[in-house]
């Protein structure tokens, strides 16, 4: 089978390419240039070239910087401007890795696209990885349903430690087993505020309000805060911990309250991405990558919006983040929180 492998220069994509080549497939590597971080690509391309030479496979360098800027980077900035919390990895998977890269794979005549994600596929549904600590099904849940039939995730049945051990047994790949893992958001060096600083003044002080609308303190600029944050702002007249409940970007205000006030039992989604045919779902939902799943009921409307009712309340639901719905270990839907 002719397979395009997304190669980043990391251990996961390297072992993915190695495994597929060893199974006798016709493997082609592809490195994506997504952003202009200095020296970032040069180092990674050297690693990809080293692996490609070792495996004796051709590789391509695909410049997707413009697409990435329009579909991932600027939406990241704009979402924070709106006082919401973005999910750039979900957008990147949908539009870039499982969008533009898949399109490139088809143009090369490849039957499949393989990535180093920790996830599995079963009956055209994304399934959680064997290694639960590294499972990436949450981020892949934004994928277009039609893309799934072209995908392969060779590491889905492996534990991360076994992937590293496997790489360390092969002389040429030993260095890949010990290299530092990449950060979750590839274009953020230290903090997301450093990215926002390039586009706006993030340090304009504003008012802190309680849930009744009373001014109780000051903050250092609304973009420094996300829902649930409990530090970095002033609250006068109380010793009880306070958390960010809401952000008003136009007024440069943050509304804070007690942990009890963070509780939410219902929320809405826009543009639900369904992997099964349904008008209602009785399932479990994850409201952020590292959160535990919570039982819920989902009502889906004609305009693809949805209302979610949780069995147990959750704390700190952030608008802009992705909610991912599971039936046991399979992803059945996803959508962005209103």
Swiss-Prot record:
The keyword Repeat does not apply. One of its GO terms (cellular component) is cytoplasm. Its EC number is 2.8.1.13. The gene is mnmA. Belongs to the MnmA/TRMU family. Disulfide bonds join 92-186. This is tRNA-specific 2-thiouridylase MnmA. It comes from Campylobacter jejuni subsp. doylei (strain ATCC BAA-1458 / RM4099 / 269.97). Keywords: ATP-binding, Cytoplasm, Disulfide bond, Nucleotide-binding, RNA-binding, Transferase, tRNA processing, tRNA-binding. Its main location: cytoplasm. It catalyses: S-sulfanyl-L-cysteinyl-[protein] + uridine(34) in tRNA + AH2 + ATP = 2-thiouridine(34) in tRNA + L-cysteinyl-[protein] + A + AMP + diphosphate + H(+). GO terms for molecular function: ATP binding; tRNA binding; tRNA-uridine 2-sulfurtransferase activity. ATP binds at residues 6-13, 32, 116. It is found in: Cytoplasm. Pfam families: tRNA_Me_trans, tRNA_Me_trans_C, tRNA_Me_trans_M. GO terms for biological process: tRNA wobble position uridine thiolation. Catalyzes the 2-thiolation of uridine at the wobble position (U34) of tRNA, leading to the formation of s(2)U34. InterPro entries: MnmA-like (IPR004506), MnmA-like_C (IPR046885), MnmA-like_central (IPR046884), MnmA-like_central_sf (IPR023382), Rossmann-like_a/b/a_fold (IPR014729). NCBIfam families: PRK00143.1, trmU. Residues 134-136, 288-289 are annotated as: Interaction with tRNA.
